[in-house]
């Protein structure tokens, strides 16, 4: 806000100055001068004159009621509070003084005291809307949203046309997750004031929360007619378009917002995410790094590392980037670590905690579900879950049934969760997210449990020294190949994780090439996993097999646009590409009936999509590189005896693809027998993972009980106890 223009002395001020010159000890003249100076917004001079008057004559205590708001306007909150309290001693029933004190206390962060003062003001003036508003605002500032909503409604009962109170009620209802009620408030504001931009923005947010995004987009569009260059409106429209999957439009809108005003970190993150999803990894990285510089946070840092794991083939650079995460976010917490009183008994029942945001309809849940079910029966382990998400679906309820000691930690800070974990006396705490979204790695950095490990959720190191182990198997992380890329010591079990086929999976179809007369390659991976280099390699094979087609699954709202441009650059016409939109799990799995061989992208190959394809009879042709994320696909292929589908370099990838396309009977036989191959391997035996994990945990625990530092661990299949859910050794 601009300061008011300087107003020269009025005749009254000049008269007071002459009187003071004639009699400098007359407190009344100083008081009158101060009051008239405040009237012309000359606050510093007015405050000085009032203080002089009070110094000359302490009986002029009523002046504190004039002095207090002026001190408040000057930002001198401590002095303003003192002045208000002195004034209230003399005028205890003055509601305006109590409200003024409440406002200063609220801005000074003294929220309980502010509510008390605002409450006294409200009691003194129950029919005064502005006084009642002070109480509502104080309640809102203190996070007492239900009481604040009631107070704002009281204001509106007194003054129905009070638009600020109606806006504030809407914002309070949003805090209470009553987005429908909030939307009504903002709509009422717009009925009375159609050009109120803030009401457009907040109503749009409510509509998005209510899954009415197309209405929100239309609302933002109407507001932009009023304010076409409003960067905030454009940003909100961009967020909305992004949520609707309109990635090209969202990117353009967010870029326009960023060009009009210095973008905040939220705009940069959203723009970076659009660019990431559209395959523009270079620009995505640049924007996420800018967002990190503007508002450093562990979550933003994790998002950047997630992108780098998809795009970097430089092992040293990727390793250094992950270790920088630990240096930045773990080091400041070292002094806060507390000792662990856990009983060092190597043979006792162990309390195992799992921390994850993905225990819902997510790939992690698909892998972990059979393990939870089997470990529930263990007599030597007790499972605990710390779930960091508000999603509660059928999968969540299934998993909760396996783990009665289930804690909801979404919305709790790290200190509170650490207290919970220590109260549960957890012996080994397992991270199931790594650097994926909604992770709690800063919780692990506090070392709430004596032994900590990362598993399944992320193809790479956490970068934390507090994370003792990373759980894998000998195919996923071959001995010595990637160990130096991890802060953690590698635990190699017989199988990293089981794969539970989806109930909606149809039967395996015959090889489609036999009926089509040509081979069809396919990729069902997320578009943001597919790099330009991967498309270039796939295109070499498509050029070498000129009648082949390629099916690209999982597309939505043009997120495959960049990929199509890359194919075109490589001379692969649109007529050779078959696009299939993202759909239900059953329909997605059925689409494999149209594919003979799948490709894995690189440098981030993935595992879940490979397992889905294998269950549907489709092998995946893959490569490996110098980083751990490039190895995930081979892990499951190797367990099924399909290491021959690994190509060592580009030339062998093309040669192998050509060979397979010319040997359809071999592919057909492999397809027909794939499920038997799947179910007879360790991948088809969840008991291998459950027993392997239990033994690995025991070895990790014994290491801690002996006071030894973590070291690499190997669990062999032959070490596991036999049972119905175990393959023959």
Enumerate the language-model features and the residues they cover.
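Alpha-helical solenoid repeat scaffolds of the TPR/TPR-like class and their adjacent stem/linker regions
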Residues: 1-518, 536, 565-572, 584-597, ...
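A short structural motif in glycosyltransferase catalytic domains
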Residues: 601-603
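Short glycine/serine-rich donor-binding loops of glycosyltransferases
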Residues: 609-610, 633
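Short alpha-helix at the nucleotide-sugar/activated-sugar donor binding site of glycosyltransferases
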Residues: 613-615, 638
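Short acidic/histidine- and often glycine-rich active-site loop of Leloir-type glycosyltransferases
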Residues: 630-641
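Glycosyltransferase donor-sugar binding loop
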Residues: 386-391, 549-562
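Catalytic cores of eukaryotic secretory-pathway lumenal/extracellular enzymes that build
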Residues: 577, 582-583
């Amino acid at each position: 806000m601009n300061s008011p223009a300087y107003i020269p002395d009025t005749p009254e001020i000049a008269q007071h100055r002459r009187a003071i010159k004639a009699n400098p000890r007359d407190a009344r003249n100083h008081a009158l001068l101060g009051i008239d100076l405040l009237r012309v917004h000359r606050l510093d001079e007015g405050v000085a004159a009032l203080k002089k008057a009070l110094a000359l004559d302490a009986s002029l205590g009523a002046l504190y009621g004039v002095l207090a708001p002026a001190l408040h306007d000057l930002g001198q909150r401590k002095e303003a509070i003192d002045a208000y309290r002195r004034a209230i001693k003399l005028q205890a029933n003055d509601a305006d003084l109590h409200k003024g004190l409440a406002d200063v206390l609220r801005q000074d962060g003294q929220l309980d005291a502010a509510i008390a003062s605002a409450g006294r003001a409200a009691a003194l003036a129950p029919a005064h809307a502005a006084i009642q508003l002070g109480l509502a605002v104080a309640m809102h500032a203190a996070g007492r949203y239900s009481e604040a909503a009631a107070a704002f409604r009281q204001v509106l009962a007194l003054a129905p046309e009070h638009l600020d109170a109606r806006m504030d009620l809407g914002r309070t209802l949003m805090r209470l997750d009553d987005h429908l009620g909030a939307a009504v408030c903002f709509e009422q504001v717009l009925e009375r004031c159609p050009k109120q931009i803030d009401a457009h923005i907040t109503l749009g947010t409510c509509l998005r929360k209510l899954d009415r995004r197309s209405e929100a987009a239309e609302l933002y569009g109407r507001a932009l007619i009023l304010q076409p260059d409003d960067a905030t409106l454009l940003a909100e429209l961009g967020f909305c378009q992004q949520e609707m999957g309109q990635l090209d439009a969202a990117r353009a809108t967010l870029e326009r917002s960023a060009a009009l005003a210095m973008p905040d970190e939220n705009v940069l993150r959203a723009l970076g995410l659009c660019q990431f999803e559209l395959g523009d990894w270079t620009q995505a990285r640049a924007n996420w790094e800018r967002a990190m510089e503007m508002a450093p946070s562990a979550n933003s840092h994790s998002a950047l590392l997630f992108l780098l794991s998809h795009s970097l083939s430089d092992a040293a650079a990727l390793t250094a980037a992950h270790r920088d995460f630990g240096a930045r976010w773990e080091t400041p917490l070292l002094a806060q670590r507390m000792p662990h009183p856990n009983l060092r008994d190597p043979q006792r029942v162990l309390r195992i905690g799992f921390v994850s945001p993905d225990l819902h309809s997510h790939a992690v849940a698909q892998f972990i579900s059979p393990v939870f079910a089997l470990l529930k029966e263990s007599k030597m382990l007790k499972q605990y879950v710390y779930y960091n998400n508000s999603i509660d679906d059928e999968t969540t309820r299934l998993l909760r049934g396996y783990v009665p000691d289930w804690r909801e930690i979404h919305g709790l800070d790290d200190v509170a969760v650490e207290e919970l974990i220590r109260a549960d006396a957890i012996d080994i705490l397992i991270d199931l997210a790594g650097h994926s979204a909604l992770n709690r790695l800063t919780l692990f950095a506090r070392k709430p449990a004596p032994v900590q490990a990362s598993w399944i959720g992320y193809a790479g190191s956490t970068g934390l020294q507090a994370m003792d182990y990373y759980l894998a198997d000998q195919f996923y992380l071959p001995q010595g190949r990637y160990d130096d890329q991890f802060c953690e010591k590698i635990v190699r079990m017989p199988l990293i994780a089981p794969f539970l086929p989806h109930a909606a999976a149809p039967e395996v179809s015959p090889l489609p090439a036999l009926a089509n007369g040509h081979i069809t390659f396919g990729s069902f991976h997320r578009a943001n996993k597919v790099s330009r280099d991967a498309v270039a390699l796939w295109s070499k094979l498509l050029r070498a097999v000129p009648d082949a087609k390629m099916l690209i699954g999982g597309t939505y709202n043009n997120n495959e646009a960049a990929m199509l441009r890359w194919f075109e650059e490589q001379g692969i016409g649109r007529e050779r590409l078959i696009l299939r939109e993202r759909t239900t799990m059953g329909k997605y799995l059925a689409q494999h009936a149209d594919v003979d061989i799948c490709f894995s992208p690189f440098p981030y190959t993935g595992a879940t999509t490979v397992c889905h394809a294998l269950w549907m009879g489709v092998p995946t042709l893959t490569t490996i590189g110098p980083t751990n994320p490039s190895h995930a696909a081979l892990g499951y292929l190797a367990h099924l005896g399909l290491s021959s589908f690994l190509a060592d370099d580009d030339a062998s990838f093309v040669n192998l693809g050509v060979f397979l396309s010319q040997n359809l009977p071999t592919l057909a036989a492999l397809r027909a027998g794939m499920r038997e191959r799947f179910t007879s391997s360790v991948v088809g035996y969840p008991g291998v993972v459950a027993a392997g994990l239990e033994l690995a945990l025991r070895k990790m625990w014994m290491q801690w009980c002996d006071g030894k530092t973590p070291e690499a661990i190997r669990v062999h299949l032959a070490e596991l106890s036999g049972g119905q859910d175990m393959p023959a050794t």
